[in-house]
Regions:
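The beta1-alpha1 cofactor-binding region of Rossmann-like NAD(H)/NADP(H)-dependent oxidoreductases
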Residues: 42-43, 58-71, 90, 128, ...
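Alpha-helical segment proximal to the catalytic Tyr-Lys
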Residues: 151, 195-196, 256
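C-terminal substrate-recognition "lid" of short-chain dehydrogenase/reductases
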Residues: 158, 236-270
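Canonical Rossmann dinucleotide-binding motif of NAD(H)/NADP(H)-dependent dehydrogenases/reductases
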Residues: 4-36, 193
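Active-site helix of classical SDR
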Residues: 146, 182, 190
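Short, small/polar-rich loop/turn modules that mediate ligand/substrate recognition or access, typified
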Residues: 198, 203, 233, 258-260
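Residue(s) in the substrate-gating loop at a strand-loop-helix junction
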Residues: 166
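Catalytic Tyr-X3-Lys loop
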Residues: 90, 101-143, 158, 162, ...
Length: 271
């Protein structure tokens, strides 16, 4: 049954060319929202926009001027902006090898009862550029999006924002200091913004997905994926549809009493 409780609402979703973002776009469109699809890849943005009968707005979320212009264009065109989902992100690709090294060391430790793991060199070899890019895409991108949208929502005195963090923002992992730091920052930022905007009728929440079956997991080896699944209580990766249902709940009237909250969906990974 098609629930039309989002009928007439306008949603802006970053990183929606594939994976979680595309699932969010489809789910909100299913319930009547008009979706503006952002992605760094113009073709990916246009593909999702075509599927959900929305419009594409391709740009790099680390470009604050581009973000401001995009939100201004949406408001000028529709006269409102109801929903922002800050989803754009990049995987800790550069640390996939050190993730595997950490797992290998843990296995060695269990097998030989070694009391100390060998030191990891991922942090000392992490470049300024890799650190900066990770922080800028996740944390700066979320800030730029919220700042631009809140200028509109402040005038409207309504709106909902969902910032996508990660379980690694709650429980940091070896080999992902830059990713964990960025995602933890999103959690703190979300709580602060929610406190500032609640009196305006604006709700701001964060979602911390666990390991979800998306292209972001492509860099991980079979060894890494096997180790991850063994730690998930449910015994499998999550699906984009499961996270999309949670996000749909948070942008709708069903969650009208929720703001400043962090919702974890990890299958029991960090229980």
């Amino acid at each position: 049954m098609n629930n039309s409780t989002l009928e007439g609402q306008v949603a802006f979703i970053t990183g929606a060319g594939s994976g979680l973002g595309a699932a969010f776009a489809s789910r909100l469109a299913q319930d009547g929202a008009f979706v503006v699809v952002n992605d760094l890849d113009p073709q990916a943005a246009q593909h999702t926009a075509s599927v959900v009968e929305g419009i594409a707005s391709p740009f790099d979320v680390t470009d604050s001027s581009a973000f401001d212009a995009a939100i201004s264009d949406v408001f000028d065109r529709f006269g409102r902006l109801d929903i922002l989902i800050n989803n754009a992100g990049i995987a800790p690709n550069g640390s996939a090898a050190s993730f595997d090294k950490a797992i290998a060391n843990q296995m060695l430790r269990m097998e030989t009862r070694i009391s100390e793991m060998q030191p990891l060199d991922y942090l000392t070899s992490l470049s300024d550029q890799d650190w900066d890019r990770m922080i800028r895409v996740h944390l700066y991108g979320t800030f730029y999006g919220c700042r631009a949208v809140l200028r509109v929502m402040q005038q409207q005195r309504f709106g909902t924002i969902v910032n996508i963090s990660s379980i690694l923002g709650q429980s940091p992992s070896a080999g992902a200091a830059h990713y964990s730091t960025a995602k933890a920052g999103i959690i703190a930022f979300t709580k602060s913004v929610a406190d500032e905007t609640a009196h305006l009728g604006i709700r701001v929440n964060a979602v911390c997905p666990g390991y979800i079956d998306t292209p972001l997991l492509t860099p991980f080896s079979e060894l890494m994926m096997a180790a991850i699944v063994t730690r998930i209580g449910i015994g499998r990766l999550g699906t984009v549809g499961e996270i999309a249902e949670l996000v749909r709940f948070l942008v709708g009237p069903e969650s009208s009493y929720c703001t400043g909250s962090v919702f974890t969906a990890s299958g029991g990974y960090n229980a």
